[in-house]
Amino acid sequence: MNLINKKNLNIYLCGPTVYSDVHIGNLRTIIIFDAIFECLKNKGFSINFLHNITDIDDKIIEKAQELGISEAELTEKYTNEYFKILEIFNIKKPTKIVKVTEKIEKIIEYIKLLEKKGFTYYNKNNDLVFDILKIPNYGIISGQKIESLLDKNTKKTKSKNDFVLWKKTQKGLFFKSFFGLGRPGWHTECAALIYDYFQKKSLDLHGGGVDLIFPHHENENAQHFALTGNPIAENWFRSGFVNLNGKKMAKSLNNVLLAKDFSHKYNPDIIRSIFLSINPTVPINLTEELIKNHKKLIEKYQKICFEWYFDKKNEKTEKVEQVLNLFIEGKFAKANFLIMELIKQKENSTIRKIFLNLRFNFTKMHLNPESQEKIKNWNKLIMDKNYSEADKIRKELWKIFKNS
């Protein structure tokens, strides 16, 4: 990521479509962001992070009708569930979270600007559509060739990938607009929110999964370029797929591990450890064996934070900086190699500082002030070579630490 000479970072990450519970794979990007943002703050960066909630969508309408409740009831439930998940997995809330339905007027204004500039037309369903052929660099985000996107049935005057800005419909939740009754398209929702919140500026960083590169990120960029002549983001951060037992994790395939179910069964720090151990774009195959290995690793990390109380050497600031920089650059495997080297060298203060910046929940574990007296007693017993009594105190303190 090229963040040179930037101290105030404008960042966006697409949020969930709130018609069901999020699965563990949905959390990969935001957990990585949570850790990287803390690393950036450690270097003096200020983070302005916008995260959206898609609370109007065909899937939402279908689910609400199936359950016999309103879209608002359904989305309120799953939005609150999502916020609970963020808390459980120790993910800091973004600077600003915005629901699409709260910004319909802004989205309509945004679409009007695109129409006024001549980037739109009405399709056979009377939906207002964006004409991608009006964007000379369409495909720059995804590497698509514009020639391959042409629709052979329209004599090369239209593209099969022209996308809906405003869908004309009265099914489910819909809104009044200059384009008729309907609701906005997904690609436009995100682009309009970015344009509004960041005052037409390009983002310093846009995040999302690799599955969103085309068409979602490409279409966001096309709209922003149409209105400003600039890309929607100067840097992109994308995370790879999370598979479950060798198969794609997807609700449509009924092959998911819900985040809430993971947290009921395992320590949430385990998934943070997994996500931060593998370079971001590399696919992860989540298995019981992988979870078990990282469970052992978290226990090891907890012990290191406990050992720090007995040997508070000065942290090596340059080593902390080196590791955090590697995480910022997305070189997770190399960063973890250096952490293992520091563990071998018993640099507990340095390692603990790194873990604090990666926002592992276990860093909140502590020994209370009353325990400090026991540590003094332990030191005295060690000096007196009364190792059996010292060991008893250490075991007592470990219990206090684990339960803190």
Curated annotation (Swiss-Prot):
ATP binds at residue 251. It catalyses: tRNA(Cys) + L-cysteine + ATP = L-cysteinyl-tRNA(Cys) + AMP + diphosphate. Its EC number is 6.1.1.16. InterPro entries: Cys-tRNA-ligase, Cys-tRNA/MSH_ligase, Rossmann-like_a/b/a_fold, tRNA-synt_1_cat_dom. GO terms for biological process: cysteinyl-tRNA aminoacylation. Binds 1 zinc ion per subunit. A motif ('KMSKS' region) lies at residues 248-252. Its cofactor is Zn(2+). Zn(2+) binds at residues 14, 190, 216, 220. Pfam families: tRNA-synt_1e. It is an enzyme of class 6 (ligase). It comes from the Bacteria. It is found in: Cytoplasm. Keywords: Aminoacyl-tRNA synthetase, ATP-binding, Cytoplasm, Ligase, Metal-binding, Nucleotide-binding, Protein biosynthesis, Zinc. GO terms for cellular component: cytosol. GO terms for molecular function: ATP binding; cysteine-tRNA ligase activity; zinc ion binding. Its main location: cytoplasm. A motif ('HIGH' region) lies at residues 16-26. SUPFAM superfamilies: Nucleotidylyl transferase. Monomer. Belongs to the class-I aminoacyl-tRNA synthetase family. This is Cysteine--tRNA ligase. It comes from Mesomycoplasma hyopneumoniae (strain 232).
